[in-house]
Amino acid sequence: MFTAQPISNDVELLNLVPRTVKNKVNNKLKKIITLEEIREAVDNMEEDRAPGPDGYNANFIIICWDIIKNDLLKMVSKSQRCGKIGGCTNFAFLALIPKGKEANSFDRFRPISLCYIGYKIITKIMASRFKHILLNITPENQGGFVKGRKIWDNIILVQEAIHSSLTNGDKGMVVKLDLANAFDRVSHPFLFQVMLRFGFAPEFVSWVKACISKPWIAPLINGRAAPFF
């Protein structure tokens, strides 16, 4: 099992991060959340997705919108204002989905978090605001997970480079790196330092940190939730 290690505060490395996030962008990231943003976040969810510990999915929010919309706004606004995820909002069920028929070990299962609907709304709004600046802070050679870019562009580029090398008789070497569970192995403290170096406002970084720090998880075993830990 992977265990996080303390990171070194490598100032020289962090100084290489360009400060590309300006005040105008930060003002957009920090602007007060509106009911329209909350409704857009809910409308962009799949209505019949399995609920989290609260038992509510997007369909419930849509049906009861006129009754609960103001309470939702208070909850989300307080989270933004305090930079915290309050109450049980960061509680989640953990379901293991088999990757194939021969799923007989933990590495053959994909963990899926079933989160509180309030948590989903907060992170949807945050992601919606964040995606508009990804193009400005992500290098052009990063082809995946950025709207408007295609991951296969880099594949074609590598194929062309290899073809050219073979055609011209040039000597060279190709190294392929595939990091197992790369997403889970990224150091969160390091990411927060990088965000600050990019120029993200400390308030926004704290809000992001609150969303992924100190979660409470209850594994689902044979359809029943084990104790939270």
Give the ranges of each region predicted by the language model.
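Conserved catalytic palm subdomain of right-hand nucleotidyl-transferase polymerases, strongest
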Residues: 49-56, 88, 104-114, 153-196
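Conserved pre-motif C helix in the palm subdomain of viral-like polymerases
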Residues: 2, 107-138, 156
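Conserved polymerase palm-domain catalytic core
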Residues: 179-229
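Conserved helix-loop functional segments at active or binding sites
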Residues: 132, 163-167, 217-218
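Surface-exposed loop/turn segments and immediately adjacent short secondary-structure elements
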Residues: 1-107, 113, 121, 225
